[in-house]
């Protein structure tokens, strides 16, 4: 979500369409460093252990913008090893690392920390160590477009604090194994805040303890696997109200934490859209993936983020995206963008997580597309496809959607609108809405609470659609040019072929004779093939460019 918000923020500043601004500011060839590799590469010093449990215990000194605490790492060894890597930004101090009650030697390189054990940890062994740390965390200049802490005022003279760290990584504020491929199985999050304030984090509140130093500790337990950037603190003088939804897996708790002055507005806005969203997404994607942890919306001083079971909300109770329809069709103003989009990530992003940041299209393309599925559930398929088509004006084709692997880099912001249009095309090609819904639900079942690769997702869709879509995905995800359908009319016959980067590109496309019904043709790259459509002539030849994001060229 951060990339989309970044694009939209710059657009707001320059009063032009967001994705165009992104191209102008960020276009260029990037060079990667040793620090990028340490952050993005799953080296043997990271793959040697499988993280099972964290207990993050942190105290937030708001006045001094200072944090201190510890994180317990409980893990299982996947191989024999005596050294491992965890991650913590170098502006934060590692006070000590303890193993069996004794300090461990450690060294730091950029934002990586390496520890040496006194003996070999054997494969299959379960062990734990604790990292004690402190410091002034990075303060985000404009969260969630950049990562870190947000220290704000709630408008009533009280502090309002939040974290947001997608892409830059959770190690910007707490020590962890900061690689998307390894999600912790469960986690206890203990947050001490000044008396009179509340911390609202992921999962369920287990305990509130008044300490003797002017602080109150809130213990939140997350019972499901969670990606590191999905772990969040939200601190304010929150007011709470709740509801329930009887969904596909029974009763789901709905909890809302908002600023006091916004309670009435929140009751209306959340009441209008949350249950509608959950009903639509359970229909399309299957049961909400985190029933045991519940569903929360938490008002934040930044726009929003898909923090698992605790969605950050900052859309100011307006329809659309802060009052705007990103598709310019009108359909985007019939719902709250942050509620729908960020909650869509509970299925694609939190339930299914990409192993590498390079494959973030798995999160963002599907969640962009989820917006249209929400529209379809309530307003019909035509409205949904109009919305998808309307988002095309945001496509830049500036760089590939899939980024280089192993350097913690995400690809083009086109993963939102171009990715959504790609998925709509795949659906049209499958030409079986029941099957398409089965595929979407099946993805969330087959990869339930898992980290995945692009290959796994594409292979699943191809297998269940009974059509190999690998070349279609490759063209749209790995190249900046879109395929062009070239056609010609000669001696009373129509001919067509694809011009594409991918050799053997073989996407079916819908065409028709004006006034007739659409039919699929199956052009290839290379030589022209005959288009067998009775009565077709240059003056009545039409291609379904409403649903197919392609170029057209007459020879």
Give names to the regions the model predicted.
Residues 93-99, 200, 469-470, 489-546:
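Beta-strand-rich binding/interaction modules
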Residues 22-68, 152-159, 179-181, 470-471:
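N-terminal, polar/Ser/Thr-rich
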Residues 289, 412-494:
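Amphipathic alpha-helical substructures
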Residues 35, 39, 44, 132-187, ...:
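Glycine/proline-rich low-complexity spacer/linker segments in large multi-domain proteins
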Residues 25, 84, 89-152, 213-214, ...:
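A surface-exposed beta-strand-loop module
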Residues 70-91, 175-179, 184-194, 455, ...:
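Surface-exposed beta-strand/loop patches in extracellular or lumenal glycoproteins
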Residues 69, 165-166, 177-340:
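Hydrophobic helix-coil surface modules that form long, contiguous segments used
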Residues 223, 360, 364-425, 447:
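Acidic/His/Gly-enriched intrinsically disordered linker/tail segments
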């Amino acid at each position: 979500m951060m990339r989309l918000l970044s694009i939209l923020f710059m657009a707001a500043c320059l009063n032009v369409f967001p994705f165009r601004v992104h191209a102008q500011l960020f276009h260029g060839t990037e060079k990667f460093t040793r620090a990028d590799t340490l952050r993005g590469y799953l080296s043997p010093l990271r793959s040697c252990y499988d993280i099972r449990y964290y207990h993050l215990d942190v105290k937030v000194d708001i006045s001094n913008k200072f944090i201190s605490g510890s994180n317990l790492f409980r893990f299982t060894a996947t191989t024999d090893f005596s050294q491992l890597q965890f991650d913590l930004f170098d502006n934060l101090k590692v006070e000590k690392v303890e193993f069996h009650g004794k300090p461990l030697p450690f060294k730091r390189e950029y934002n990586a920390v390496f520890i040496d054990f006194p003996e070999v940890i054997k494969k299959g062994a379960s062990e734990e160590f604790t990292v004690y740390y402190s410091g002034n965390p990075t303060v985000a200049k404009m969260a969630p477009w950049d990562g870190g802490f947000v220290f704000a005022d709630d408008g009533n003279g009280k502090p309002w604090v939040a974290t947001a760290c997608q892409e830059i990584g959770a190690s910007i504020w707490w020590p962890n194994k900061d690689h998307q491929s390894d999600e912790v199985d469960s986690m206890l999050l203990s947050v001490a805040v000044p008396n009179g304030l509340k911390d609202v984090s992921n999962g369920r509140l287990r305990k509130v303890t008044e300490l003797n130093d002017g602080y109150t500790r809130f213990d939140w337990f997350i019972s499901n696997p969670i990606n590191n950037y999905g772990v969040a603190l939200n601190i304010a003088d929150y007011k709470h109200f709740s509801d329930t939804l009887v969904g596909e897996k029974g009763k789901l708790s709905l909890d809302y934490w908002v600023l006091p002055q916004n309670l009435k507005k929140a009751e209306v806005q959340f009441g209008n859209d949350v249950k509608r969203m959950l009903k639509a997404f359970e229909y399309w994607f299957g049961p909400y993936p985190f029933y045991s942890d519940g569903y929360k919306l938490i008002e934040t001083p930044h726009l929003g983020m898909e923090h698992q079971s605790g969605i950050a909300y900052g859309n100011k109770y307006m329809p659309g995206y802060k009052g705007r329809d990103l598709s310019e069709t009108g359909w985007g103003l019939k719902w709250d963008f942050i509620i729908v989009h960020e909650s869509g990530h509970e299925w694609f992003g939190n339930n299914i997580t990409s192993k590498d940041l390079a494959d973030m299209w798995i999160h963002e393309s599907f969640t962009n597309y989820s917006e249209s599925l929400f529209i379809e559930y309530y307003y019909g398929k035509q409205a949904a496809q109009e919305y998808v088509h309307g988002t095309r004006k945001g496509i830049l084709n500036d760089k590939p959607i899939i980024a280089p692997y192993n350097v913690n880099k995400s690809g083009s912001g086109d993963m939102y609108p171009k990715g959504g249009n790609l998925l709509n095309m795949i659906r049209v090609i499958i030409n079986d809405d029941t099957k398409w819904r089965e595929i979407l639900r099946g993805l969330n079942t087959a990869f339930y609470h898992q980290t995945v690769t692009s290959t796994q997702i594409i292979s699943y869709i191809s297998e269940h659609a009974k059509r190999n879509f690998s070349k279609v995905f490759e063209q749209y995800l790995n190249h900046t040019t879109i395929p062009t359908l070239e056609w010609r009319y000669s001696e009373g016959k129509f001919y067509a072929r694809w011009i594409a980067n991918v050799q053997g590109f073989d996407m079916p496309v819908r065409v028709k004779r004006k006034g007739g019904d659409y039919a699929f043709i199956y052009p290839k790259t290379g030589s022209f093939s005959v288009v067998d459509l009775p009565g077709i002539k240059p003056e009545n030849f039409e291609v379904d460019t409403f649903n197919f994001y392609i170029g057209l060229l007459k020879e």
